[in-house]
From Swiss-Prot:
Residues of the signal peptide: none
Protein species of origin: Rhizobium leguminosarum bv. trifolii (strain WSM2304)
Localization in the cell: Cytoplasm
Entry superkingdom: Bacteria
SUPFAM superfamilies registered for this protein in UniProt: Trimeric LpxA-like enzymes (SSF51161)
EC number(s) on file: 2.3.1.117
Protein name according to UniProt: 2,3,4,5-tetrahydropyridine-2,6-dicarboxylate N-succinyltransferase
Amino acid sequence: MSATDLASLEKTIEAAFDNRDNVNTSTKGEVRDAVEAALDLLDAGKVRVATRGADGAWTVNQWLKKAVLLSFRLNDMDVVKGGSGNSTWWDKVPSKFEGWGENHFRAAGFRAVPNCVVRRSAYIAPNAILMPSFVNLGAYVGEGTMVDTWATVGSCAQIGKHVHLSGGVGIGGVLEPMQAGPTIIEDNCFIGARSEVVEGCIVREGSVLGMGVFIGKSTKIVDRATGEVSYGEVPPYSVVVAGSMPSGNATMGNGKPAPHLYCAVIVKRVDEQTRSKTGINELLRD
């Protein structure tokens, strides 16, 4: 699709979103066609909810988030087939794999293990592997990435190339508030089992999160080497584990010192060469 066509599509969706109270399941014509076209482009990976510039800054294409939100108004509830034992679900969003056969899967080039769930408008790149997991609408999963068992990729989340999302990992989805950016895991990251990255936080390229690390917008990210505290973004090639920080001079009602509070701790930083040659377990040893 040309830049002119994309601009026209964006204009139609922006206008429809501004008038969304009048968009419903009976809406036909230009608005429905535009939303369907946007979802198809997302599904095929031809557009993304967020794109990374040469300077490392991420730009959010809000109109694509608006297209996803409008689809909930346009689509009625319907039976979704494909459950075990010929069971069904009841939802507004069909499976990405609806109507797929061998040719579709071979052309797509990724592995989809039984019981993985991918909703329409999510993109899965070639050589990705989906264990029994959940990938929500509008998400992007990059080439060669492993989404391990019971991991969740939230709505519009952006997962880079050659990422490993370990068992039970949660990558948060962000559709609303509209101005919020999606949660982003850049290329070559490892996210340890049962960790959570949410609320539009960014894990930069080559970083390693140990098991059970939780990062939201209000989570303190502490660099152990410098004492620097930051929020919302893990720097490139950081090795991060769960930790805690003293509450300073704060006390409880009984006069005793207040408990320590959770934080994420950057225990070391490695260069690209070291990261590529060193095993994950070795990196996480203190």
